Amino acid sequence: MFANINIRKSVWLFLLAAVSCTLFIYGVTRTDLQTLKNPSSLTSPSSSTSVDKKKPLFTKSPRNSASCESTITLQSNLLFTYYKHYFAGIKKVALIGFPDHPNKGDSAIYVAEKKLLDALNIEVVYITAQEADYSASELKSIISDIPRDEFALAFHGGGNFGDLYPDHQHLRELVVRDFPSFTTISFPQSVWYNEQQLLEQASILYAENPNITLVTRDRQSYGFAVDAFGKHNEVLLTPDIVFFMGPIPEIREATPITHDVLILARLDHEGGQQHGAEDYYRDTLNAANLTYSVEDWLLWDPPVAQNPDSSFDDRGQARYEAGAEFLASARVVITDRLHAHILSTLMGIPHIVVENSQMGKITNYHNTWLHGCTLDGVSVVVDSVDKALSLLLEWNEAGYF
């Protein structure tokens, strides 16, 4: 499977023993390899936000959460190192695929992407959210005076690479056709195709544009992308871009607690929980004298994001902050959303993750990068709501939240 990978750039890096991960990472130069062998030597602008060792991120976990905090820092530093290398020489980018919708997790991705680009002193000169507001002629005009080797197309990350969300994929493919041979780098994605024909079409298109670098965020997506695209395009494996933010306990600390338990359950076609079925939880949580809320963060949007005159930056920031504060309003979270899992981890909110969707997006990511955070009072992944409720009661009895 790996015979066609560019050996000069795609070398084994190191086993992530320090965080109990069982994966290997590809896609950096030999110089980067020497640096990454000693993760503690890595620095990034987000490193300064690392949690004070005297104040654990998860204050009620029965075990020291240092392994989780080390996992977070390592992922942040890996992201900075990878993108510093692959954006080397780039001064300006067009960001394709802004998430102009109420999914707060996608807005967290956007905010993290902008933070990373800012850290690399890269200016975003053009942003488009969807095909309806994309203009090839406008973008060509904007970049006409920019040296070709100083400009790149940057594809928004997340979980929409493939045919599960065809509008997002179609926009990327349209831009690739309009700007062939341009340096193009994606932010980390999960990859999922149901239709072989659509996969083959994408593979052929990308093969015609070898300057495209695809970045995946879990082992399953990485292996799939290498098989489908790796003969002609470089394929990388990195953490989800939101981990570039590093620990953000200040959001949790500044947000008033309004209930004990938040059950954040998807209402879209990826979901697998008892969606919005408050009756399913009521008896169990009431018997334990736990206050609760059952909701999906897709159901509402902050006022700034609803203002058609607001900027993409303002909408993205408002949605991200609203989502983070939504999570922080509870002492413990049960969720089937990946970025509720990630943001809860970064804020130090104990949480239980339910994974029973066909994609396995959460499990794939957790098993790739977050073994060091699998601790009581920190985070645990289960495969049913019943198991989540049972574990929640155990945590409550033990005082883990």
Swiss-Prot record:
Signal peptide boundaries: 1-30
GO MF term (any one): pyruvyltransferase activity
A Gene Ontology BP annotation from the UniProt entry: 4,6-pyruvylated galactose residue biosynthetic process
Region: Disordered, residue numbers: 38-64
Keyword presence, Zinc-finger: no
Residue spans of biased composition, Low complexity class: 39-50
EC numbers: 2.-.-.-
Keywords from the named record: Cell wall biogenesis/degradation, Signal, Transferase
CC terms in the record's Gene Ontology section: cytoplasm; Golgi apparatus
Functional note: Involved in cell wall biogenesis. Has a role in the addition of Gal-beta1,3 moieties to galactomannans and their subsequent pyruvylation.
Similarity section: Belongs to the polysaccharide pyruvyl transferase family.
Protein name, as recorded: Pyruvyl transferase 1
Species name: Schizosaccharomyces pombe (strain 972 / ATCC 24843)
Gene that this sequence comes from: pvg1
